């Protein structure tokens, strides 16, 4: 069994990309379980064709404790027999969102949910790789990380930040970077830009996912493109990405770059963001550094 994880900046299309890709992998005969590790709990809705799955933390709070739950309470089966679990998170401003991830994974392991699977996929928020969100990496659960990014400044900044988190645990937990997935935003020279970023991070751009209205049309019906329009070219893009993940042997220890090098890369491609966007990056960087200092 291989344990993979999809990380990416909020709003980059990480959950949509992962669900479409995993749907294609399941259709090819792989036995898959998705563990949603994003407080939005939107990691499984396209597989289950529903609004949002009830989370482990929500049910545990209702029942009194996670020990009072049965596996059947939190594990649902969706498209192509993909098993689905959402860990959930606390109310905004209260507690650590990583608590739900830790609680869920421990519960699933104890209840035997990981048996008879080819892939377990963790769908993880990745704006800041704090201790909780880094848990699948830190505890050696996820062995292959795929970062969903685009040619936009904030998405690339987040990808580099995630690479830093992977590097931190690469030597102790054995986690590796499997590649960057470029979820296109139709930015100028986007393929070349992400290929160069991947090279600097000591990885590969494993696939370029073109932008398509078909994705939104499928989402309106709470479906993946694989389910909604299996013959559409966009469905084949996700199948191709899934095949590349299945056959991927280029698993590396990343070499994150500093902010000056990232800025230089954006300038070289004529894509440096506005002053407002630059301020956001600096604020996010200071917040990330404060979190790192607080964790020591």
UniProtKB/Swiss-Prot annotation:
Presence of keyword ATP-binding: yes
Protein source organism: Rippkaea orientalis (strain PCC 8801 / RF-1)
Cofactor binding summary note: Binds 1 [4Fe-4S] cluster per dimer.
Enzyme class: oxidoreductase
Binding site for ATP: 8-15
Protein name, entry field: Nitrogenase iron protein
Known partners and oligomeric status: Homodimer.
Modified residues (ADP-ribosylarginine): 99
GO molecular function: 4 iron, 4 sulfur cluster binding; ATP binding; metal ion binding; nitrogenase activity
Keyword Heme carried by entry: no
PTM note: The reversible ADP-ribosylation of Arg-99 inactivates the nitrogenase reductase and regulates nitrogenase activity.
Reaction(s) this enzyme catalyzes, per UniProt: N2 + 8 reduced [2Fe-2S]-[ferredoxin] + 16 ATP + 16 H2O = H2 + 8 oxidized [2Fe-2S]-[ferredoxin] + 2 NH4(+) + 16 ADP + 16 phosphate + 6 H(+)
Function: The key enzymatic reactions in nitrogen fixation are catalyzed by the nitrogenase complex, which has 2 components: the iron protein and the molybdenum-iron protein.
GO biological process, one term: nitrogen fixation
InterPro entries named in the record: NifH/chlL_CS, NifH/frxC, Nitrogenase_Fe_NifH, P-loop_NTPase
Its EC number(s): 1.18.6.1
Gene giving rise to this polypeptide: nifH
Transmembrane spans: none
């Amino acid at each position: 069994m291989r344990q993979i994880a999809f990380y990416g900046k909020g709003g980059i299309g990480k959950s949509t990309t992962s669900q479409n890709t995993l749907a294609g992998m399941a259709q090819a005969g792989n036995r898959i379980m998705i563990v949603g590790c994003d407080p939005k709990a939107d990691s499984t809705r396209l597989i289950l064709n529903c609004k949002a799955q009830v989370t482990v933390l929500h049910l545990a709070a209702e029942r009194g404790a996670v020990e009072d739950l049965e596996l059947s309470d939190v594990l649902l089966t969706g498209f192509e027999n993909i098993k689905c679990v959402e860990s959930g998170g606390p109310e905004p401003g209260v507690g650590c969102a990583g608590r739900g991830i830790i609680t869920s994974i421990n519960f699933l392991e104890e209840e035997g949910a990981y048996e008879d699977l080819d892939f377990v996929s963790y769908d993880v928020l990745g704006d800041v790789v704090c201790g909780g969100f880094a848990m699948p990496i830190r505890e050696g659960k996820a062995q292959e990380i795929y970062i969903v990014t685009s040619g936009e400044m904030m998405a690339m900044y987040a990808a580099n930040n995630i690479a830093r988190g992977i590097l931190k645990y690469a030597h102790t937990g054995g986690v590796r970077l499997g590649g960057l997935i470029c979820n296109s935003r139709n930015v100028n020279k986007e393929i070349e830009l992400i290929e160069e970023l991947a090279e600097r991070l000591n990885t590969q751009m494993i696939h370029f996912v073109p932008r398509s209205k078909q994705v939104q049309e499928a989402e309106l019906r709470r479906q993946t493109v694989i389910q909604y329009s299996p013959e559409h070219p966009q469905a084949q893009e996700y199948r191709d990405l899934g095949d590349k993940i299945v056959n991927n042997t280029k698993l590396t220890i990343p070499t994150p770059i500093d902010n000056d090098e990232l800025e230089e890369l954006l300038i070289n491609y004529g894509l440096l963001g506005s002053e407002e966007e630059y301020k956001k990056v600096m604020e996010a960087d200071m917040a990330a550094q404060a979190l790192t200092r607080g964790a020591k």
